[in-house]
């Protein structure tokens, strides 16, 4: 199904969608998106900054993070235009959880912002040169959010009181996006996983690897690459709307996305692509989760 939705002929792009049509799109109409990393850095200077040999991403405690942004998944480094940069702050693609509070914080954290993964591609024209793309996962789109939430809910219901490992994989949908002849070099990096270790005396299924699950996330990929100044401005507003802060609700059930719910969460999905005019509303409370977030100021307890 993912291959059919992401076939080159049907792939939504800025060459097939006019500027006016793109302005009328709801943010929730964008399930997944791809654009050159360099273009993303230029369009989102508040969310990403190149400082020397570092690609700086605002940490949860920094004011810029409270204004929105992305959950960047990586291994600490990213290559751009042949140069290797260190990530100053990012989320690890694999974490271990040992209690319900950690699980709850992790779940809320990964769903609080759009996800970003780095994609390295060898083109058909020049197989020796890699291009770096940013792959965006809109966790506020009902289709994407449903796949993540249902994956987490289903594995819990099947392994009550036992340890388990759950992985979310985007390799197939990304590889199907690019035309034949282009090679995704780092497909294994297009995933994230967590392992919940329960305090069970006999964890046979976990010991033998029978409680490992993988959810292959599928969706329609929007091509946000463009050289047109007008369309670049539209893309900028589009990205800002996608990454606006998500307001925390009073209970978990209230925070779950519903197309019929009313209130601030649905403001993210209106047709107005202008940036939020006021930041005086309560913003999502960032979660101090040291085993998830990597930064140069925070020691990594898993290395």
Swiss-Prot record:
Q: Does the keyword Magnesium apply?
A: no
> Among the entry's GO cellular component annotations, what is one?
cytoplasm
Tell me a GO biological process for this protein. positive regulation of fat cell differentiation
| Disulfide bonding pattern of the chain | none
Location within or outside the cell: Cytoplasm
| The entry's keywords | Cytoplasm
* InterPro entries the UniProt entry points to: MEDAG/TEX26 (IPR043460)
Q: What does this protein do?
A: Involved in processes that promote adipocyte differentiation, lipid accumulation, and glucose uptake in mature adipocytes.
Q: What PANTHER family does this protein map onto?
A: MESENTERIC ESTROGEN-DEPENDENT ADIPOGENESIS PROTEIN, TESTIS-EXPRESSED PROTEIN 26 ISOFORM X3
State the name under which the record lists this protein. Answer: Mesenteric estrogen-dependent adipogenesis protein
Write down the species.
Bos taurus
């Amino acid at each position: 199904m993912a291959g059919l939705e992401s076939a080159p002929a049907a792939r939504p792009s800025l060459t097939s969608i006019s500027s006016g049509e793109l302005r009328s799109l709801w943010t929730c109409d964008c399930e997944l998106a791809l654009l050159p990393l360099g273009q993303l850095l230029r369009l989102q200077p508040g969310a990403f900054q190149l400082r020397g040999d570092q690609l700086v991403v605002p940490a949860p405690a920094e004011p810029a993070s409270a204004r929105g942004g992305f959950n960047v998944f990586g291994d600490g480094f990213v290559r751009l235009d042949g140069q290797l940069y260190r990530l100053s702050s990012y989320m690890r693609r694999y974490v271990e959880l040992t209690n319900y509070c950690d699980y709850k914080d992790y779940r809320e954290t990964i769903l609080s912002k759009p996800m970003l993964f780095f994609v390295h591609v060898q083109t058909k024209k020049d197989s020796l040169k890699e291009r770096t793309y940013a792959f965006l996962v809109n966790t506020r789109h009902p289709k994407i959010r449903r796949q993540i939430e249902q994956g987490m809910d289903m594995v819990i219901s099947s392994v009550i009181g036992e340890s388990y490992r759950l992985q979310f994989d985007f390799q197939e949908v990304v590889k199907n996006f690019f035309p034949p002849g282009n090679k995704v070099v780092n497909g294994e990096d297009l995933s994230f996983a967590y392992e919940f270790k329960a305090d069970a005396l006999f964890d046979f299924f976990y010991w033998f690897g029978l409680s490992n699950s993988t959810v292959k996330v599928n969706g329609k990929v929007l091509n946000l690459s463009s050289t047109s100044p007008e369309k670049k401005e539209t893309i900028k507003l589009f990205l800002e709307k996608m990454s606006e802060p998500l307001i925390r609700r009073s209970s978990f059930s209230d925070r779950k996305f519903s197309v019929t719910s009313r209130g601030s969460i649905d403001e993210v999905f209106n047709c107005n692509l202008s940036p939020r005019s006021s930041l005086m509303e309560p913003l999502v409370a960032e979660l101090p989760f040291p085993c998830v977030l990597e930064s140069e100021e925070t020691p990594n307890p898993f290395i």
